[in-house]
């Protein structure tokens, strides 16, 4: 299988680059920015992409690629910081820009060069997405300018003439972001036309590869899988089951942090998947350990440790634990020296105890949510399971802000059920990426039945997204929001005020904690 390597310099969009490549039917892998030429040869890619990053190539904290990658004879595309790293390597000059560019910009393609740039073939002047404070101010020898913007004369560069055979390209903007109108076409031009890659990556190919990997990892050992009934754990369980059959033991943990009637619903449809399944009711244990804990990070750590303990109590001879960890989980959990900061530890990653007795199998670790659903369809999983909204591993513990109690959980469950019920009955549930309620650690004064009340404030959250990496708040109809608010205040005891969250990601995250 032909592949592309993305070298990560810490951009928040690195995972999006990988996703856009896969949308073209090409397999992609992400490796650290300082990966050696020897390691790259072992992966045998057909092309290399250098991601963006938050540092300056001329600063003391500059992180630069291994110089040997430019001697491998592979086509290379640098994006934003990647462009600047290329310019520096080949003797160009990068400096701080007097006017920074963040957001949309108009890109003008240079048409007077000979021969025509293969990278910009069939690409008109159009909007692109910028996010930079530095820019190339002196062109490296052997390069030409192929596009410009109002603030970046050298918006795109490429080798030509005697250096043309190197096939090194750079873009100051981000083709992987949806706001760049022809970004996907640019990537296609680079990977298919310039690098000569034949698209051959698909959900079926991924499944076949993972089945081989799982069998090689697990061997004849038995494996335990914590399953929640959500998309990720369900697809992970079925995929592992395809690989090792009855050697997979699934455990559904009722942690007391689930949505209303969730345990019964989950057990019903999981049995239809033909999995060997055990129910472990540990709700009292979780709530006891979470008592008076307000810190979201502490909640996640406690929940991660308790999950593992519960699994270990269900163990017979199992040596491995399956988790439905996805790419967005990893990028929000792992801080690489130099690149992007840790935003929050994820239940499936940073929340696990370091001295865990089980080895991990994470078959979905390199997939985005939409890819997980595509794999699930290939596996024959029912659509009503695949199209469920994402639900956090720590459950409602991170949607009850502040300390968690059974009383506050019940209030949130009742309110959240009304919100989801109204979304489904109004035909809006499948139009949003994720929707949920958050019980705030705030009380407000109200009046009900001529009496003063002092009760909880609830926030409603609904977002639109394609992968969870970025998200816009969903502009739900006002009459719909009014109906939901009215029902919650009148039907749920303990809430007298409802707010709607209109924050996008970034700067906010989708979940509040």
Swiss-Prot record:
Question: Which superkingdom does the taxonomy of this entry point to?
Answer: Bacteria
Q: Which reaction does it catalyse?
A: XMP + L-glutamine + ATP + H2O = GMP + L-glutamate + AMP + diphosphate + 2 H(+)
The enzyme's main class, written as a single word, is ligase
Q: Which GO terms describe its molecular function?
A: ATP binding; GMP synthase activity
Per the record, its GO cellular-component terms are: cytosol
Q: What pathway does the UniProt record associate with this protein?
A: Purine metabolism; GMP biosynthesis; GMP from XMP (L-Gln route): step 1/1
| Assembly with partners or alone | Homodimer.
**Name of the protein:** GMP synthase [glutamine-hydrolyzing]
Q: Which organism is it from?
A: Chlorobium limicola (strain DSM 245 / NBRC 103803 / 6330)
